[in-house]
């Protein structure tokens, strides 16, 4: 929610692209996006990955949890994809938090390829990588149950839930 609030005008003006936007942003925050395809999203109410919910009918509802990859996987499954390739999912941030709510700072990490990418990053959500790992475990569980294979093609990174595949091999 925080990310879109800061750039709603820019997103609204985008031409020639589909914009999947949670309807809750319109309902609760009065953020309307031109030509949006709105979807209903519901939060998870558990910390146990095998109890995380996933939607097989995204026209009714999708479930979120800590990372947009969880939502994207539901869209891909609904569209019939049997393979999902994660690219650029570092799963490691300059500033993050753990499950105790403690802030963790790693000065060796640069979050974006340019300092201008998110100039308002200090006001954005601080990711909880422990919760995100649980989310990726749930994503793997649900994809496995649907015979969908998820590969991590990220160069480097800290995400080790999915089997690795070399990024360059995707281009051969």
Across the structure, where does each feature detected by a protein language model lie?
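Metal-ion/cofactor- or nucleotide/acyl-coenzyme-handling active-site neighborhoods
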Residues: 1-172
């Amino acid at each position: 929610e925080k990310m879109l609030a800061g750039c709603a005008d820019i997103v609204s003006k985008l031409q020639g692209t589909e914009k999947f936007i949670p309807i809750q942003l319109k309902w609760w925050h009065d953020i309307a996006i031109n030509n949006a395809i709105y979807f209903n999203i519901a939060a998870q109410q558990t910390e146990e990955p095998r109890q995380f919910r996933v939607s097989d009918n995204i026209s009714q509802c999708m479930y979120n949890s800590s990372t947009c990859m969880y939502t994207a996987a539901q869209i891909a499954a609904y569209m019939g994809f049997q393979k999902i390739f994660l690219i650029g999912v570092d799963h490691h941030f300059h500033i993050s938090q753990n499950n105790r709510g403690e802030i963790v700072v790693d000065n060796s990490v640069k979050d974006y390829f340019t300092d201008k990418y998110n100039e308002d990053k200090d006001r954005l959500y601080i990711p909880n990588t422990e919760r995100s790992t649980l989310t990726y475990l749930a994503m793997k569980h649900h994809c496995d149950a649907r015979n969908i294979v998820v590969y991590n093609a990220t160069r480097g990174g800290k995400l080790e839930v999915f089997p690795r595949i070399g990024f360059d091999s995707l281009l051969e």
